[in-house]
A protein has these predicted regions:
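Alpha-helical transmembrane segments of multi-pass membrane proteins
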Residues: 1-249
């Protein structure tokens, strides 16, 4: 109760930062002491941290205010929450008794995936806000988001093959790769609308459209990754079905 109510005296994103730190600290204390209450409390506080973080997003990014690039409380708080969630996942992996606990629990792989989601959202919200507020062009934020999305997926899938603590199941790699490709294809009409707006109303922003061609190259890399994942992990029947779906897309 004290752990949940103490940070209420703080303001805004400081509550989220406090709960993120406290969740990691309490789980670490549980591993050292074996006190089950610390373990359960850490997980509950982590969930409340996510709720608080969502409220921070609404308050910060819906205000319409011009925020400093990178050095703003929205991005910093989200990155901190992602880091705390990742460290919590590492602690859960060290918990040899974790599989034997029948009560409420959050697995390490779920924490790891949520940490990656938070990391992704941190960049996506920052890019969307900065380009929406600072530039008058409609869909320019979408253009840069569609550069960020495939770049993020490529980097994460590459790191997951190099760093043991970042290893992801192939199903997750397949899902995020396919989702990234589909999101790009879905946004193609926005690219044409932006191109028309730039040519007719703002030719000084023509250089921005170079980002679109870079995005196309990254999406081509994702297509290659998707094919490699399917070949490595799907049987012949599923592979044929997947091939038809890919070409249909």
């Amino acid at each position: 109760f004290v752990s949940l109510t103490a940070p209420i005296q703080l303001k805004g994103n400081h509550i989220t930062l406090f709960w993120a730190s406290e969740a990691v600290l309490l789980y670490w204390l549980y591993l050292k002491s074996g006190i089950q209450l610390s373990r359960l409390t850490a997980q509950i506080i982590w969930v409340t941290m996510l709720i608080s973080l969502f409220m921070d997003w609404v308050n910060i990014y819906s205000s319409g205010q011009v925020l400093p690039v990178v050095a703003n409380k929205g991005l910093i708080t989200t990155l901190f929450a992602a880091a705390a969630t990742f460290f919590l996942a590492l602690l859960v992996k060290k918990d040899v008794a974790e599989e034997e606990q029948p009560e409420f629990k959050i697995s390490a792989i779920h924490l790891q995936v949520i940490a990656l989601i938070l990391l992704f959202v941190a960049g996506a919200l920052e890019i969307n806000h900065q380009f929406s507020i600072r530039y008058p062009l409609q869909y320019l934020n979408v253009l840069y988001l569609m550069l960020y999305v495939p770049a993020f997926v490529i980097v994460i899938t590459l790191l997951s093959t190099k760093i043991k603590s970042l290893v992801l199941p192939w199903q997750i790699k397949l899902g995020i790769t396919a989702a990234s490709i589909l999101s790009y294809l879905f946004c193609i009409p926005s690219f044409f609308s932006l191109q028309k707006e730039i040519l007719e109303k703002a030719p000084q922003f023509t250089a921005h459209f170079t980002v679109h061609w870079i995005s196309m190259v990254l999406v081509a890399v994702l297509f290659y990754q998707l094919i490699q994942i399917c070949r490595s992990h799907l049987n012949e029947t599923n592979l044929n079905n997947a091939s038809w779906k890919i070409w249909g897309t």
